[in-house]
Swiss-Prot record:
The keyword Signal applies. Keywords: Endoplasmic reticulum, FAD, Flavoprotein, Lipid metabolism, Membrane, NAD, NADP, Oxidoreductase, Signal. It comes from Macaca fascicularis. It catalyses: all-trans-13,14-dihydroretinol + A = all-trans-retinol + AH2. This is All-trans-retinol 13,14-reductase.
Amino acid sequence: MWLPLVLFLAVLLLAVVCKVYLGLFSGKSPNPFSEDVKRPPAPLVTDKEARKKVLKQAFSASRVPEKLDVVVIGSGFGGLAAAAILAKAGKRVLVLEQHTKAGGACHTFGENGLEFDTGIHYIGRMEEGSIGRFILDQITEGQLDWVPMSSPFDIMVLEGPNGRKEYPMYSGEKAYIQGLKEKFPQEEAIIDKYIKLVKVVSNGVAHAILLKFLPLPVIQLLDRCGLLTRFSPFLHASTQSLAEVLQQLGASSELQAVLSYIFPTYGVTPRHSAFSMHALLVNHYLKGAFYPRGGSSEIAFHTIPVIQRAGGAVLTRATVQSVLLDSAGKACGVSVKKGHELVNIYCPVVVSNAGLFNTYEHLLPGNARCLPGVKQQLGMVRPGLGMMSVFICLQGTKEDLHLPSTNYYVYHDTDMDQAMERYVSMPREKAAEHIPLLFIAFPSAKDPTWEDRFPGRSSMIMLIPSAYEWFEEWQAELKGKRGSDYETYKNSFVEASMSVAMKLFPQLEGKVESVTAGSPLTNQFYLAAPRGACYGADHDLGRLHPRVMASLRAQSPIPNLYLTGQDIFTCGLVGALQGALLCSSAILKRNLYSDLKDLGSRIQAQKKKN
């Protein structure tokens, strides 16, 4: 009975895919990846004025290029990458950034004479020959240099009543697995099954990309028939929680906690996160981790010139007030706040990298916010958890202070779900006493150029999950003028987290020069992150469901308005990059994945000839 139906649906799907492929990718736009543009990296530019000319070009009407093809809202990497790809296809693109610096979560800032990252702490799969490295090289012309971090790249620390346990995550699949087995010799078979499942699931991520291109009625039909999850391990794992999968594998509670340690990188605890998301991250780091030489601002610094050379620009201090719509309801430009005035900029295509909530709830005119397609997408997602950041300036080099390039995830309970639920539901005055986890890293130890730029000093960063509601009463206050109560409350988290850090790194006692903290309100101000949610829409099971993934695509319900960045795919640099590829493919009506594959094949063939 089922076989004829399955065969019919398979034939129908094949016909639809062919028709969609011919329709979606029928454009005559130039191929942005027609040739290999990678060249040897130029020397690191440290001159402040030279960097300022690229990263801090303030908005004025006179700096807006003429005859624009595209305006991009937001200069996070999802916006910059989309703009650069479109520029490589001959488009004149203007990127508008509300902050004083371009880069979004890739920007850096100065504090007490040192430099701090705001969002890029480590990236996986950046070795030569990897797909991610290849794509970034083609976007930045090979100017980003990636430095391998030491092994182990991560250490999970479990602070318990019986003392401290450490679980290192080593670089390389064999070493990674062996490290786990040394800690859990009785569960070797479970670890093998887990790694095998991680690889099978993550290798099917192309199915998530395909969902973004197929017509929604086809997706809905396949979903109702159960075929989406039946034939795709990735889509099936998108309906299973991480906790559910680990329990099915028979892992002990301690092993479950260790295998789940990396969940803060996507912000959702094991019972509520999709195993597909987790598998992507674990597989992403199986070969080790990397850090951009010169710091995370190098990412924007080497992407922006590609946009400029095509006649475009990246302008800061440019707060977009609204997306302009014509009489037919199509996007036709943006309105930018300049002082007390509004400057209207018109163009045929608008791309938003501001995220679903900012775009649909704040940038669209009131009548457009009520459109069924807009309301439907907003109803599918919710903002993720907020985050506090603590930035510490240290006296001494990494050698003096014995600082590792390793990241530390510090936990106090193996039941991560219960600990987090208890924490975020607490009265705010008690929360700092029960911080369930800390992320601790030393960016200065990851960057080989650091000592030349900041001799004799080091940097440390800590990340703390935080509920926006705890800080909500100060949201209307101006930055820097939120009063002593705000600073006192913020410092309660700083003191609690520093106490944990000093026990883990006692050699830092007496070496701390200064400590600065940013709350979810800080993320909201500098990154325009609603409710301080630095990962955008929550990466829970609802968000990762195949039906929702298919709905959150580059084409918005507003004609000529496209979306890019992490809300279109997943969080992180590579997730934002995928969002940019999906967005650019839709605008250019080209299969950029196919273009990249063809270029890669030609490069490999040329290497064999040589």
